[in-house]
Amino acid sequence: MPHAGISFHARRHRGRLCASSGLAMLALSCVAAPAVAQSQRDQSASEAPAAVQPTPSPVLPVQSANATPGPYQTYDALAMRGWERPLPKSGDTLLGDKLGVRDALADAGIGFIGFASNAIQYNFLQNDGGYKGRQLYNAQKLTRNVSNAAIFATYDLGRIGITNGQFIFSALYTSNSFNRVDGPNATRIGRLAYYQSLFNKKVEFKIGYFDNGFEFLGTQTGGSLAGGTLGPQASVPNEVGLSYSGFSTPTANIRINFKNHVYTKLGIQRSLPPGGATPEVAANSSGLRFHIPGTGLLTIGEVGWDQPAKPGTLATWVRAGGIYNSTNFNRFQGGQSKDNWATYIAVDHQLFQIDDSKANRGLYVGGTVNYAPPQQNFISQYYEGRIYGVGLVKSRPFDLASIVANANIYSKQGLVARTAAGQGNFKQTYSVIASYAYRLTPGLYFQPGIGAVVHPIYSPRFDTAVNGYLTLTFFI
């Protein structure tokens, strides 16, 4: 019987839209994005897919556009570079500048931030018509869909004469209570990379071991992981082999920044195996293996316009791209494809501002479309609309409220191949999720959410689920 599930993960990435403060790297879990159904990411074309249920992911703070005074400016100058949206600033951590830890490390050119997140979800209706078999989708019963802990460290290579260069390291532990759908438990190297900017940041490149989930696409609602994996949850990029948070591969990226906030970015990575994280971890538990049999080269290209919020200037981020993977994937109707590919487009726009001193505060709308060929990708189309507010409550400038609606369209060939004889199926899954990321104190975020998921699994035909979501995230 087919199984289903969703997941977190981003899946994640240079702080502009919403002038967002750091994404909580929770995305580490990702991400991109509630992100996509992990189960889908972890299965090849010949395997049963998971249900496409969205799940909010670790919360991440929306930072102020204002510079943080005092020693924090020194700490933040050592923050990890090269993401589409940055990690939280050091002032938005539980440790802050206490105990002299950051001072001592900064004196040596070292920056660091720690992060941990736990997310659960549950279908309040419990309306599966008396079904007594194994769990098929997230929230069918109380599900801990992600628990992550990560440490990020950087070293300023200017200390040894490499101006504007940075060495980046991260390690991650990830686990969940539903491995069959949400992916394997793992402890892995997350990043081991060299970043360099040239010509006053007109050119940026990064090479080493890292994931592209937070380097492209921009799958965090409001540009912030803190509020973020509630939005763009499309799994299409991951289905075709793009690496995502917690599952890095050898990668090289280059970004060129033109005038008027226009940019283009190109990435080359070793593909994840067909099936995603499960075969990746089975063959590469440490995360340091350069090549895995059966994987090819994946390239991704993106062009965009990323206008940051300024007093009187509304934020707008438009991006579009394509992915090509030389890896062979099983086709649903037999045989193998010689490659795989996907396309995407996404737009986010600030409708109005509510605080001239913090221009990122205000109301935003956005949308995302993903497509991949249905011959070998079970989710072939993904559509999303979102509306979200940053600091809408006067006394709550760091909070993020969001409503995200999406539709996942299944491959017709895939449904034929994966639906058990005598059972019906659904051709798509729809969901609407509302959530509020509440900053309890600097470095600590609490994110409750509620959502309706129509067709939580493609087969058998279960009724609409009404899920509660709860995520607690903290930064050290």
Feature locations, PLM:
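Transmembrane beta-strands of outer-membrane beta-barrel proteins
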Residues: I110-N118, G165-F169, V203-I207, N260-L266, ...
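Outer membrane beta-barrel transmembrane domains
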Residues: G275-P293, E302-G304, G321-S337, W341, ...
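Short loop/turn motifs that connect adjacent beta-strands in outer-membrane beta-barrel proteins
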Residues: K89, L95-F112, F124-L125, T154-F167, ...
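Outer-membrane beta-barrel "beta-signal"
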Residues: T464-I476
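Outer membrane beta-barrel
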Residues: L142-P274, N377-A417
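N-terminal periplasmic/intermembrane-space "pro-region" immediately following the signal or transit peptide
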Residues: P2-F8, A24, S29, P34-A119, ...
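Long, well-ordered hydrophobic secondary-structure segments characteristic of membrane-embedded
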Residues: W83, S90-A193
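Outer-membrane beta-barrel architecture
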Residues: G100-R102, F152-T154, A193-Y195, N253-R255, ...
